[in-house]
């Protein structure tokens, strides 16, 4: 997905306060965005609490439970960060100093990278779970959550290093008119970087995205192939007239395949919106649309996971009935 909120190392456009100040005067854009963020925060909080209670009760966990719980935590923190940043875009506090700008934007960028990483890891772990005993991946099925935690921790350190340039280039917007700074929010701007630094961080980001997305595509194709083979074997043994009940592993796989497809769709849509911003000379409305599109995945993904959990589905149904009766 394209780097949202101008957090990429390339200077995408110059700082123009008057042009982007129109964002916080448009109540429709502001209300739509904060509604999306509110729904995403509530859904990710519910999914995270479910996995915390599941861990406390000592229930048997699947290999993918830790990444799913971690992904909900990452998306929750990511949405909280963008909510704070969005208040300075749509409401315009203009009271943040360098430390606040660096802290919020750096954390947001780190959570955004971890979201991609954890989604990829989730796809790989589900492929391992679904793999047959004869597969070379079967030996990884019984790995403890500590191995997954170590892998996630290592990637977290890597992403923090890749985003470290923001700690230097992010500043509080000075009270002067200039075309040197790049717009992040009403209070925060990015200093231009040298060509060497731009090239280095762009290369690191490109390598990261290509590697993770390629790994995600390979694991997804592997799961699809396994499901197709299993369906053929089932039809051969039981006949086409019967519809055997899907196992929990198969249901989880379908959910993750749906999530991967949705992730790719949102990535393509995000790229299209990003390109349209270039065509329309970085119109503020296109900028707001890109912010909205780039967070649809974090908002929708918990609903995909919760649809596979009977306890959460039953809880939501009972809650809806109570609301309707009231």
From Swiss-Prot:
Primary site of residence: membrane
InterPro entries (UniProt xref): GPCR_Rhodpsn_7TM, Vmron_rcpt_1
Residues that carry a glycan: 175
Entry's Gene Ontology cellular component terms: plasma membrane
GO MF terms, alphabetically ordered: pheromone receptor activity
Membrane topology: Multi-pass membrane protein
Cystine pairs: 101-188
Segments on the Cytoplasmic side according to the record's topology features: 54-65, 131-150, 225-254, 307-326
Residue intervals annotated with topology Extracellular: 1-32, 87-110, 172-203, 276-285
Entry keyword set: Cell membrane, Disulfide bond, G-protein coupled receptor, Glycoprotein, Membrane, Pheromone response, Receptor, Transducer, Transmembrane, Transmembrane helix
One GO BP annotation of this record: sensory perception of chemical stimulus
Name of the protein in question: Vomeronasal type-1 receptor 94
Naturally occurring in which organism (per UniProt): Rattus norvegicus (Rat)
Gene (name only): Vom1r94
């Amino acid at each position: 997905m394209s780097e949202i909120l101008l957090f990429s190392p390339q200077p995408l456009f110059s700082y123009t306060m008057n042009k982007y100040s129109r964002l916080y005067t448009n109540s429709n854009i502001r209300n739509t965005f904060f509604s999306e963020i509110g729904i995403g925060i509530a859904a990710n909080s519910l999914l995270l609490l479910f996995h915390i209670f599941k861990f406390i009760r000592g229930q048997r966990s699947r290999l993918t439970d830790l990444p799913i719980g971690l992904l909900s935590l990452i998306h929750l923190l990511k949405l909280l960060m963008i909510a704070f940043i969005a208040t300075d875009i749509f409401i315009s506090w203009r009271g943040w100093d360098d430390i606040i700008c660096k802290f919020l934007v750096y954390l947001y960028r780190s959570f955004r990278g971890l979201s991609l990483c954890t989604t990829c890891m989730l796809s790989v772990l589900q492929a391992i779970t679904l793999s047959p005993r004869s597969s070379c991946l079967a030996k990884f099925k019984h790995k403890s959550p500590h191995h997954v935690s170590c892998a996630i921790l290592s990637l977290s350190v890597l992403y923090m290093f890749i985003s470290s340039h923001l700690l230097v280039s992010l500043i509080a917007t000075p009270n002067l008119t200039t075309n040197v700074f790049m717009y992040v929010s009403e209070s925060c701007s990015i200093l231009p970087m040298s060509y060497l630094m731009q090239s280095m961080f762009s290369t690191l980001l490109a390598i990261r995205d290509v590697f993770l997305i390629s790994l995600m595509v390979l694991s997804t194709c592997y799961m699809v192939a396994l499901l197709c083979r299993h369906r053929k074997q089932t039809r051969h043994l039981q006949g086409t007239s019967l519809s055997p009940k899907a196992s929990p592993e198969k249901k989880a796989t379908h959910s993750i395949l749906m999530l991967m497809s949705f992730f790719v769709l949102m990535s393509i849509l995000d790229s299209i919106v990003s390109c349209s911003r270039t065509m329309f000379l970085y119109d503020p409305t296109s900028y707001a649309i890109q912010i909205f599109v780039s967070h649809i995945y974090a908002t929708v993904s918990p609903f995909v996971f919760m649809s596979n959990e009977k306890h959460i589905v039953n809880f939501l149904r009972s809650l809806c009935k109570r609301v309707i009766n009231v």
